[in-house]
Amino acid sequence: MSVLQKITERVRPNPANLPVVLELDLARGVLTHAPTSPIEALKQRTATTLRDIREGLAHAEKDDHVVGLAVHIGTAPLPLGDADEVAELIAAFTKPTIAWTETFGELSGHSSAYRIACAADEIWLQPTGTVGFSGFHASMTLFRGTLEKVGVTPHFEQRKEYKSAAETFGGREISDANREQTQRLVDSLLEHAIGDVASARNLDEDTVRGLVDQSPIGAEQALEAGLIDHVGYRDEVYTAMRERWGTERRTRGDDRSGEARHAIHPSYVNRYNQRAQTTGRLSRMFATDRPAIGVVSAIGNIVLGPSTPGVGGTPCGCDTLSAQLRSARHDDSVQAVVLRVDSGGGSAVGSDQVRREVLQLREAGKPVIASMGNVAASGGYFIAMGADRIVANPSTITGSIGVLGGKFILAGLHERIGLVREGADAGARAGMWSEREFTDDELDVLNAWLDEVYSDFTTKAAQDRGMPIDELEPLARGRVWTGADAAERGLVDHVGGLATALRVAAEHAGAKPGELAIRTLPQMPWLDQLRPPESSETHASAVGWDLGPDGLFRAAARMLGMEAPAGVLSLPWTPHIRS
């Protein structure tokens, strides 16, 4: 190949104008949201994001060169909500799709991966692979025995019986209420998965449930049962795609016989989307006032103050998130806002602050649609509940309308390691949050405050959801729900992913599909993001960077694991759900 040919191939990736087959390799992982810093952006520049998939497939629908989509499932685990998102996008793609993989788990469960494959028109499985569509398992760890061994005594109060973080640290076994909600979570996940598989594979639900209990199932048995369409290796998958979708070409350089072969041009979805976006980037630079749906993300623990990045991730600082929502309110080009929530909650005060900004957006005449990701619980639900509509994935963990508070008593630990801590208090309750046990007065204060926060949470939730408080109360009590169950009970409005939320936002803005641009907020050059904002009302205040000495010190403290608890509106426990 000449130097000129090599340069041409770089500039024009498909010089022969072959049919394009998009490749989505889930084994390489999928990012759910855009990087929050320039450094993260550099490290993740080759990764595929949900936005790449959504925008790339949307562009491919209108591109006559694109003839199909090949999805490599692989074994990389995706969170259940992300798996819902990917499956929804694949199912909505109207051109032919093939899903292939080496195995759906190797003698282990991989139910979420198989559900994604079922969104494709056709499924291929390696001969030695298995279908591990075996259901869902949830587990939680109780630390009471371990804490006792080191002399730590947990003291937590909760509202109410389902807000079960207290037993995570103080229980020797899970409560009946916790066992009930955990069992319902996995049952709901399996019910939805069975329904999806039965519909996609044209099977009876009872038949699918029976196959779940037989998993893992070998390739030939899976083929016979109708769970897959073909048994074959990767090369056989790509040979089949070339024969179906390729253009016949006479080969010479690598095949001296000069026989005719079918050829395609594979392209990763993220690379295809980047090229498609580049072609319109210049025009968009001069059309920033184009009517748009603004997407604002609330990712991570909700904390007071800014979203200061750290090695362990970037929390959802309520000051930063509030500024982003204000920026959208003041931007005349933003016709509607999608608030993307992936948070287990945190600060009650911060959550209420964000909810206020959501309500002000609505008062300004701009519809707000909440889109729930993997988790939108407790404080994560609080910031979403004031939206015009709430959209949740069927596997989203949401609800947890409740409150908890407490501390760890460290006197026993100090005694065991020979540590002496002395102090002085100026004020009757100045030492309430020190390492000692609560006094009776302090415990009364804590419980009164938890009652007040719980009442505020449930009252506002009932108001936002338009239901009487006595109807909402049984759905609250700290209980978590899947998105599917929450929709049946009126806690969310629609079951679907971000693509569904964007469609609902366009409808509420009175726009036709595709009429509004999709803009991730804040949309600013990296250099501007590094500059300090002029005030809390300026666009730059929506970034959340703090590169001063205090900000760097807080980041260093977070690196050393010295971060404060997220807050009283936190998800009570984080179940480890394995599929």
Label the predicted regions:
Residues V296, L339, A384:
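Conserved hydrophobic/aromatic pocket- or pore-lining residues that grip, position, or stack substrates
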Residues A60-V67, T94-K95:
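Short, solvent-exposed loop/edge-beta patches enriched in aromatic
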Residues H72-L211, P216, S343-W481, L502, ...:
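Conserved catalytic cores of soluble enzyme domains
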Residues L125, I228-R234, V391-A392, V492-L498:
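Short acidic-hydrophobic, aromatic-tinged amphipathic segments that line or gate anion-handling sites
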Residues M1-D63, H72-G74, H137-A219, E224-S333, ...:
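Intrinsically disordered, low-complexity segments enriched in small/flexible residues
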Residues V67-G68, E122, H230, Q335-A336, ...:
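Residues at the N-termini of beta-strands
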Residues A486:
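Cys/His-coordinated zinc-finger cores
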